[in-house]
């Protein structure tokens, strides 16, 4: 499957941009990549710190409702496998959307779906590569 790619130096949110591509521009599949997000978010609208030097991207496409739950776990497994392929050890999964290395969060996945004529899946992924912001109370980004 060939997907259009949208690259940004800075964007508010890759997931929000995917939603606008679907609903406003009638583009129904693609990949959005950003060097930095100014309004990145996780589950429940929690802020996802998105400074330069890390990976932020969203993949969006039409999907059957019966496949929705499978995708989240498959994405987690693939990210874990990629990290392990770089000889990163002690990678663990925290259902439903986080990956940890040495008990510190290094990746978050935000899966959203919308109906616009048919069902679309929007999967946002953030991976700390260069920086892992310090949060006083929780070891997350």
What are these regions (language model features)?
Residues 81-117, 126:
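Acidic (Asp/Glu) carboxylate-rich active-site/surface patches
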Residues 44, 51, 96, 131, ...:
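Glycine-rich, flexible loop/turn motifs
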Residues 1-85, 89, 107:
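N-terminal lobe of the biotin/lipoate ligase/transferase fold
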Residues 12, 38-39, 101, 127-129:
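Short, glycine/acidic-enriched loop or turn micro-motifs at the edges of active sites
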Residues 118-141:
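Short, acidic (Asp/Glu-rich) active-site segment that either coordinates a divalent metal cofactor
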Residues 60-64, 112, 128-130:
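Solvent-exposed residues in well-ordered beta-strands and their adjoining turns
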């Amino acid at each position: 499957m060939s997907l259009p790619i949208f690259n940004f130096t800075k964007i508010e949110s890759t997931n929000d941009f995917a939603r606008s591509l679907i609903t406003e521009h009638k583009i129904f599949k693609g990949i959005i990549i950003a060097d930095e997000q100014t309004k990145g978010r996780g589950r429940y609208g929690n802020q996802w710190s998105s400074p330069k030097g890390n990976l932020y991207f969203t993949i969006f496409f039409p999907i059957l409702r019966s496949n929705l739950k499978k995708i989240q776990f498959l994405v987690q497994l693939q990210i874990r496998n990629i990290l392990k392929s770089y000889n990163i050890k002690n990678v663990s999964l925290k259902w439903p959307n986080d990956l940890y290395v040495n008990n510190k969060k290094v990746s978050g996945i935000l899966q959203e779906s919308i109906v616009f004529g048919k069902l679309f899946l929007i999967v946002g992924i953030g991976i700390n590569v260069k920086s892992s912001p310090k949060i006083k109370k929780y070891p997350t980004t």
